[in-house]
Amino acid sequence: MNRLCVLGLLIGLSGSPALAAGQGESGNPPATDKERFIASLMARMSNAEKIGQLRLVSVGADHPKEALMADIRAGKVGAIFNTVTRPDIRALQDQVRHSRLKIPLFHAYDVAHGHRTIFPISLGLAASWDPEVVARSARISALEASADGLDMSFSPMVDITRDARWGRVSEGFGEDTYLTSLLSGVMVRAYQGSNLAAPDSIMAAVKHFALYGAAEGGRDYNTVDMSLPRMFQDYLPPYKAAVDAGAGAVMVSLNTINGVPATANRWLLTDLLRQQWGFKGLTISDHGAVKELIKHGLAGNERDATRLAIQAGVDMNMNDDLYSTWLPRLLAAGEIDQADIDRACRDVLAAKYDLGLFADPYRRLGK
C-alpha cells in the first residue's frame, strides 16, 4: 500500500494522451468487434456530434422537453437523466431516429436503495452485515429500473464518512473501509449481472470519486485535506473495489482534494483511476460540477473550467452546457487537442455498446 502512496506522489499531473479516432485502446488498429464498430462510427462523426455525445441533461426549466427533443434530433445530446417512465423515455429515444447517425441515448437515474420497491437506506443495508441481502436488493432494483427503461444507476455511493455532521451520511455504507468495499463490489455485480447488455441489467456508476464523505467540517462540497497514506488505506479502497467488480461508470465528486477539485484533478481521474487501476469505463461529472470549478477558485471563467475538466479526464458533463458551448471554441483555439474530445466520445460510445443499445435502443423498453 505504501508503494501506491509513493507512486501517487511521483506521477504528478501527467497522463498518456487520449487515443485518436480509428485506433484501439492500445493505439494500434482496432482489434475487437467493439473497437472496430466505434472506430467506424467515429470516423463518420463530426466534431459537433462527438461533443453532443458528451452532454448529459435532464428535462426541466433549463432544458424544456421540446427544445431537448430538437437537440436530440440534431445529434446534440448523449444521454438523459431523471426521466423514469417508459412512455417518456421512449418518446425521447424516438427522436434519435431523426438524427443523422441515429446514435442511441442512454437513460440514468439515482437508483440508490430501491426503485419501485424501496429498501432500507444504504446505511441500514450496511448495518445488516449481510452481503447476500444487499445483493438481492440491488438485483431487484436493477430488474425494476430496467423494466422502466433505465440503463444506468448513479449508484452505489461508497463514500467513507466518519463525520456525523455531513448531510449525506445515510446514502453511504458508513465508516468501515472493509465493509464498504465489500458491499461496493456486491452492488456493482448485482446491478450489472453477468451480461451488461441483458435487458434486465443496468450499468453501475459508482460515486462520488473521490473522498466526498471526508469533506471538512461535514459541509457538503467542501475541501478535503488528507495524507496519501490515509487516502489509500481508508478512503479509496471502496472505489477500487467497484472498479475491480467491473463498474461501467464513475461519477466524479464535487469536493477538492488537497487543493485541486476532483473535476479538474488529472492525477485522480487519469493517473490513478485509468493508468494505475486500469479503469476503462465512462467518467461523469456531478451535477453542475464543471461550472463550480469557478466557485472553487481554480477556473477564472467557464472557458477555463471546461478546459480543465476535459483535460483532467471528465468524459460527460452533467446538466450545464459548458462542454457544448466551449469545447468547439477551445479546439479551434488550440487550447485542447482533438484527442481530448475523441477519448471522451469513445468512452460514451463504448458504454452504449456495452449496454447493448446499438443492437437495440429499445431493449429495456419492450416492443
List PLM regions with ranges.
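Bacterial N-terminal signal peptides
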Residues: 5-16
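Glycoside hydrolase catalytic-domain context in secreted enzymes
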Residues: 19-367
